[in-house]
């Protein structure tokens, strides 16, 4: 192996006339392939673009110091150093034999951008395509709001004294019912739409959405929401914050319930006013009044909030009042209730008593559900 390398070195020097150290440099760079080394030598311009940088020997160094090594560098190496920053973005480069021109170059996968760089690209791309920065929505204490243009009607003054002023109606802005306003919030680890869930920057399903934002376009999924209307998209920068899911808006209870306080709450069906009036008239006609006997008027306060007034004879019994209530409110037939006086508050338990015996002449009776 050593003999083959020595033979290649001699041939390289014989062909190019270069010094042995320089010949060895090109052969080592080409993996000791003579043809590749010669091609690299002539492509680099031979003697014209080779600079030998020798390390100066300090005067204070003694004779016993080991001789310094020479480093041979081409101008191409200097250019390569200037391009290192660009190569970092493109991916790491690998060389499989030969020089930069004659060998095979392999470029690795591009370096992934951090979320901070990704957000920068989104804002930069949006601005390049016409997006503008707006003031924050919230105002500090004492901060005045921006004036809004007048949108009402007014009077156009006449151009001459004899011309009368004319009223001019203001033009109303037409807003489509399909217009959509969306807030895109860019967080440290992802993005969200309005008060929605966090969506990752690295999720492939979100790549098309983010690319549309970077190009200054409205993403397709937002256009579908508008159904042909206008989409207003606001972008908020929260890249230094972790995603926090907003609290849901308070919703008042809209269901049904029962009022506390009654021993056995019941739901009573109500009829239409016309049907109710018909039932009350039928109930009143069912009470037979003997005009030759003394009469009295009884006021009845019903459990459903209604009020009935009926004429009775003194000889009518409390049970007749119960029947009258059931006829006036047929829904009460299947409901358990009692009758009570208002003052003093006492239950009328013995319904066989007459109104006179129970001292209910011209009285007020209350119905209570049980």
Curated annotation (Swiss-Prot):
InterPro entries: NSFL1C_SEP_dom_sf, SEP_domain, UBA-like_sf, Ubiquitin-like_domsf, UBX_dom
Residues covered by the UBX domain: 291-368
Modified-residue entries (Phosphotyrosine), positions: 167
Principal subcellular localisation of the protein: nucleus
Function statement: Reduces the ATPase activity of VCP. Necessary for the fragmentation of Golgi stacks during mitosis and for VCP-mediated reassembly of Golgi stacks after mitosis. May play a role in VCP-mediated formation of transitional endoplasmic reticulum (tER). Inhibits the activity of CTSL (in vitro). Together with UBXN2B/p37, regulates the centrosomal levels of kinase AURKA/Aurora A during mitotic progression by promoting AURKA removal from centrosomes in prophase. Also, regulates spindle orientation during mitosis.
Subunit and interaction comment: Part of a ternary complex containing STX5A, NSFL1C and VCP. NSFL1C forms a homotrimer that binds to one end of a VCP homohexamer. The complex binds to membranes enriched in phosphatidylethanolamine-containing lipids and promotes Golgi membrane fusion. Interaction with VCIP135 leads to dissociation of the complex via ATP hydrolysis by VCP. Binds ubiquitin and mono-ubiquitinated proteins via its N-terminal UBA-like domain when bound to VCP.
Record protein name field: NSFL1 cofactor p47
Gene: NSFL1C
């Amino acid at each position: 192996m050593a003999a083959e390398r020595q033979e290649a070195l001699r041939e390289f020097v014989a062909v190019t006339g270069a010094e042995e150290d320089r010949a060895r440099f090109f052969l080592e760079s080409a993996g000791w392939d003579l043809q590749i080394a010669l091609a690299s030598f002539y492509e680099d311009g031979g003697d014209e673009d080779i600079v030998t940088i020798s390390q100066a020997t300090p005067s204070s160094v003694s004779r016993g110091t080991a001789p310094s090594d020479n480093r041979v560098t081409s101008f191409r190496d200097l250019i390569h150093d200037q391009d290192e920053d660009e190569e970092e973005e493109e991916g790491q480069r690998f060389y499989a034999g030969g020089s930069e021109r004659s060998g095979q170059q392999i470029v690795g996968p591009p370096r992934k951008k951090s979320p901070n760089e990704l957000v920068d690209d989104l804002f930069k791309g949006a601005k390049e395509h016409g997006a503008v920065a707006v003031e924050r929505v919230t105002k500090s204490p004492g901060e005045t709001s921006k004036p809004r243009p007048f949108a009402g009607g007014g009077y156009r003054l006449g151009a001459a004294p004899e011309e009368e002023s004319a009223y001019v109606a203001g033009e109303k802005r037409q807003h489509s019912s399909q217009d959509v306003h969306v807030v895109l919030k860019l967080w440290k680890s992802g993005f969200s739409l309005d008060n929605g869930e966090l969506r990752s920057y690295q999720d492939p399903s979100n790549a098309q959405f983010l690319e549309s934002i970077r190009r200054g376009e409205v993403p397709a999924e937002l256009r579908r929401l508008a159904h042909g209307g206008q989409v207003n998209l606001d972008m908020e920068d929260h890249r230094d914050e972790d995603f926090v899911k907003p609290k849901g808006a308070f919703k008042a209870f809209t269901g049904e319930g029962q009022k506390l306080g009654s021993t056995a709450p019941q739901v009573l069906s109500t009829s239409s006013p016309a049907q109710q009036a018909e039932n009350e008239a039928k109930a009143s006609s069912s009470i037979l009044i003997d005009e030759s006997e003394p009469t009295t008027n009884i006021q009845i306060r019903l459990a459903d909030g209604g009020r009935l007034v009926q004429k009775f004879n003194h000889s009518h019994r409390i049970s007749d009042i119960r029947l009258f209530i059931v006829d006036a409110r047929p829904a009460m037939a299947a409901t358990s209730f009692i009758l009570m006086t208002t003052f003093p508050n006492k239950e009328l338990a013995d319904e066989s008593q007459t109104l006179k015996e129970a001292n209910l002449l011209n009285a007020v009776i209350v119905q209570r559900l049980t």
